[in-house]
Amino acid sequence: MSRMAEQQLYIHGGCTSATSGRTFETINPANGNVLATVQAAGREDVDRAVKSAQQGQKIWAAMTAMERSRILRRAVDILRERNDELAKLETLDTGKAYSETSTVDIVTGADVLEYYAGLIPALEGSQIPLRETSFVYTRHEPLGVVAGIGAWNYPIQIALWKSAPALAAGNAMIFKPSEVTPLTALKLAEIYSEAGLPDGVFNVLPGVGAETGQYLTEHPGIAKVSFTGGVASGKKVMANSAASSLKEVTMELGGKSPLIVFDDADLDLAADIAMMANFFSSGQVCTNGTRVFIPTKCKAAFEQKILARVERIRAGDVFDPQTNFGPLVSFPHRDNVLRYIAKGKEEGARVLCGGDVLKGDSFDNGAWVAPTVFTDCSDDMTIVREEIFGPVMSILTYESEDEVIRRANDTDYGLAAGIVTADLNRAHRVIHQLEAGICWINTWGESPAEMPVGGYKHSGIGRENGVMTLQSYTQVKSIQVEMAKFQSIF
């Protein structure tokens, strides 16, 4: 593919040049080619976007619930019509296999938008009787202008997960995509405008997180920030948001999630789940079950089943329908994952497979890392303690239920957890003791629109998706009505 035209900001219904004068490049990680030069938003651009959003939000909030719902449904239709086109762009920008982006990324994002478009008329207040002559009623009112800051692994899906409930509740959103994968968020802005969204209600500001992101989190005109990314960055976003104007925050941060296989489990099922929990999207999923706990007596058989399934991984041309494994998102990220792999070897974990870059003409110019499985791991190893965000599985053994629950919870993270067992009593008993916000029994990874997702501990604050997220983009106003004559003590 030839190099794309220089990408601008999207403010008030159209593309516009950044006043900062700064640019950055976005790279195709499959081959190292530059896809496009992208303009970076500066402080003045953030000010422009906020003013635009404030104007648009008033128009948007004044529409009826059904009017807003129809516009968002039109956007859903356009997204589905252009699924393949958007998936191709997402594959170029992220390196993910087209077999994945064409069936997951846009599809699941559009599902969430459709879900919230349908919920808009159901955003109701309540009426609370006090006595015969008095009652209270409540209203869910929009926050105003909110900011979304996305991660690089699911660019358009995250943009939709954040914008759908925000817009459904009557807010305007300024979205900053990751500078690593900024392209599809700009296309989403065009789609929203085409669907009839008033100018300014969804603005997109590409830029570097330490600059553009910081300007957004500090801006007094922003009422809430929804952030997806790493823990360290999340802490900075939260601190800036609180220090500037006590903004509300939603944080979807990192994870080091446990997958517990019990001795009564079907090991074929367990191996299938472990593969999806570690190598889907080349391991670049925040909920990955990278700590795989297996009973000691089942370890050898389980390892053989994993090795057999690794042979089914097909890396190569990301547009080949048979490819199910792509490069990592960038060369700096590849190098970081390789440092973790080297650390695992240094600390005594045994490499069952992988452990290096993929080699060959198809891979030499890209950010490719081989699917890697470590075994004979211990809880104190760096690869077991820290989030790697790559195709690296760690296998650990255990002896008892109480032991594995304790060890599974022995982490600062609490995003996800899963168990594989034939005993449903055990399944519920154990899941209720795991310190994680998203849990799966005999499955892994699905996050439908109806399901609230978010973490415990350092893995985040608040939730995305589900009814409660729509409500979190509103502020509740309570109004008391008195029908009798008011009595003053003065």
UniProtKB/Swiss-Prot annotation:
EC numbers: 1.2.1.8
Positions with a binding annotation for NAD(+): G150, A151, W152, K176, P177, S178, E179, G230, V231, A232, S233, G254, C286, E387
MF-aspect GO terms: betaine-aldehyde dehydrogenase (NAD+) activity; metal ion binding
Cysteine sulfenic acid (-SOH), modified sites: C286
Keyword NAD: yes
GO biological process terms held by the UniProt record: glycine betaine biosynthetic process from choline
Pathway, per record: Amine and polyamine biosynthesis; betaine biosynthesis via choline pathway; betaine from betaine aldehyde: step 1/1
Positions of the catalytic residues: K162, E252, C286, E464
Complexes and interactors: Dimer of dimers.
Family assignment from sequence similarity: Belongs to the aldehyde dehydrogenase family.
Name the record gives this protein: Betaine aldehyde dehydrogenase
Organism: Escherichia coli O7:K1 (strain IAI39 / ExPEC)
Taxonomic lineage of the native organism: Bacteria, Pseudomonadati, Pseudomonadota, Gammaproteobacteria, Enterobacterales
Gene expressing this chain: betB
